[in-house]
Amino acid sequence: SLGIGLTLEIKLDGDSMTVCIPADKIQESENKGIKSIELMPFFGAADHTVDGYLLYPDGCGAITKYANVDQRSKNVKAFTWDIYGAEQVDFNECKQMEKDQKYQAMLPIYGIKNGDNAILAAVEKGAEDTSIKVSPDGFIVNLNRASFAFNYRHFYKINLSNIVVNGASVLRNTMGTRVDKEMIKTDREVRIFFLSGETANYSGMANTYREYLIKSNLLKKVIIENDNIPLALELFMGIKENRLLFDKYVTMTTFKNAISISEELKNAGVDSMQVMLKGWTKGGYGLYPVNWPPEKKLGGKKGLREFSDYARKNNMQIFMRNNFIQADSKNRGFSTRNDVVMQGSNLPVTGMGKTEFLFNPFFALQRFVSFFNEFSRWCSEGVALERIGINIYHDYNKANPAGRAETIEKWEDMLDTVIRNQRPAAVEGGNQYVLKYADRLCDIPVRSSQYNITDEEVPFYQMVVHGMIPYTSEAANLSYDLTMHKLKLVEYGCMPYFELTYSKSTNLNNTEYNKLFTSYYINWYKQAADIYNEFNERLKCVWSQKIIEHDKMEENTYRIRYSNGITVYVNYSKNDIECDGYSIKGKDYIVVGKGGVIN
């Protein structure tokens, strides 16, 4: 009666099943359309009497256990994650999420375990316009369930005071919501893997998904057998301090200083480093959209070339960090009408101060290509791209409209440009579309958003990626407990990572980067070298290996098994414990080889 219809195509494919909704077989009436379709919302649903849980990719990964239904509020709600980031383009909401440590879904998956059986569902087509919905027992019905919702139209806000009838505004200072007229015309397809027995758990799901990504050429192999675990060193170089009359440039690390710090670390035994330079461009960090040239006060182009030569001679991998997505109108160099992301109301997407903008994906790619051509004339280093593994968005810009799929294409074009020119590419964030390009992943979360439906955090993302692409989480020098931070690196398989400066961090107190509250290299380089040497002595044997099993043995104790037969036990408690017949000291870890030999 609504004049709406669709076709659901279901096919069995070995030990998996595909479910597809072809775009050309969706029917809509003249005045009625589809906003979203929730696919098979009760497939695999179970109540609290079943031994099982729901898995979802919130940050590192999280699970909701059926048995804990009584520990949840009677008014428990479902939670939804937009895959690859929020559907609504909102500067302020994005900043608040990061401030509150709320994470997004970087992988387009969910899992359901019911006793000795489990499913893993993964979006194969249309992930960028899909949401993951997790509904615990007690929300509407007494069933635990998870599903995908395919989004076919976006909502956008309009100012209702702009609507005029008979010469007068209908509603003053009131915002309303509209929906796109045109449907997103892409096929949607989900693959559902069936697991049983010993594989019917989140470890089995991670193994299944990793092998699927490898087979589909969606996950790059970067780490080579017997590689050292590199020290990830980020050097913060410069930033402007805003003052009443004249801004002051604050120099934290020059190119010559970068060589000095690298030498200190090398002399302390660090012979494998990945160095990332941050705030190296003219004007300093955060002066978007300036991407070139190097700041003269840091040594300019000559200093960059000297550091590049030093790095090449010492077999160091260098990444020059840059941002091609964000812009600030105070810095000029772009049009706030033609070059930035627009809302459906034909107004630009801005932050609270109305000076922050996002670049249209086509314009962002154009700026990147221009930068890369000039950059390549001066050095042969790698590029680190901020935000492209975190942010995708749609743009109503009339000159160059873009959906979320087109935005991903432009981000992939940037990465492809780097790789085709035989440069390494680092990416901030780890959305799945970067995994076939990235040589390094930055800021990968080692926790979930800790919503009230979550019972346990699991390193699902790390289990998929470990042994393939190196990744970092948070800077060790900014942790409040270095020992506990180190144990988290061991459990989650992260590179040791420090963000340091040549000058004292107190120089940043009056800048917008005062979050780097302890970074003076004199205070940290020995600890960085100690962790590097310890990890390579004890954990090098698993660096290139896949994590095939992760188990919580008891409170604060975890067992991680690798594809070469080596097992690592991590004890976060202050007390010594016994686990599987092995003694583990408080706040420590052990590495057990195939023959039971402890390292």
Regions from the PLM with identified roles:
Residues V270, C379-G382:
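A structural motif
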Residues L12, A23-K25, P41-F43, G279-T281, ...:
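A mature extracytoplasmic/lumenal domain signature
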Residues S1-T251, I259-M273:
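Carbohydrate-recognition beta-sandwich/jelly-roll modules
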Residues I224-R367, I390-H394:
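Aromatic-lined carbohydrate-binding/catalytic grooves of carbohydrate-active enzymes
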Residues L39, V275-K278, M320, A384-R387, ...:
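Conserved beta-strand positions
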Residues E28-E30, A46, G284, S329, ...:
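Intrinsically disordered, low-complexity acidic/polar segments
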Residues Q104, I112-I158, E182, A327, ...:
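Active-site-proximal substrate-binding groove within the catalytic cores of carbohydrate-active enzymes
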Residues I21, L265, A311, L489, ...:
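Conserved, mostly hydrophobic/aromatic
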